[in-house]
Amino acid sequence: MFRRQQRVDPKARKVALQIGGSRMALGTAIFLATRPALRAMRFPEPGPTGVTLAKLGGGRDIMIGALTLSARSNPERLRTVILVSNLCDLADAAAFAYAARDPQMRLPGVTGVLSGAAAAIAGFWAWRRLGGA
């Protein structure tokens, strides 16, 4: 009849929402200003295929960020969405590790591994803490 209010760790919620907001901001920059964003991340000048793939990734980040922020009032949904976000960050880190084998991609590859892994670590921390108190 009455649902018990689930306690939410405020720090974990804040971290999850910051990850969502950062993902939206970066995704928007990549989607709307693809070449300047890629240059800022030290990628070599992309061709049309690279620009298209970067825009796909930017769009993905916008949507995952929006889903994260939209789940701010629902602890169970926020936990599920941050898990998806974390898995995407791990996949990104793996893709960057593979790309870093190419000398032209070494700097953006290593940077991508570090940033993807850091985001996943923070996200998994939040995910674990959002699991209920």
Describe each region flagged by the PLM.
Residues 1-133:
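Short amphipathic, positively biased membrane-proximal segments
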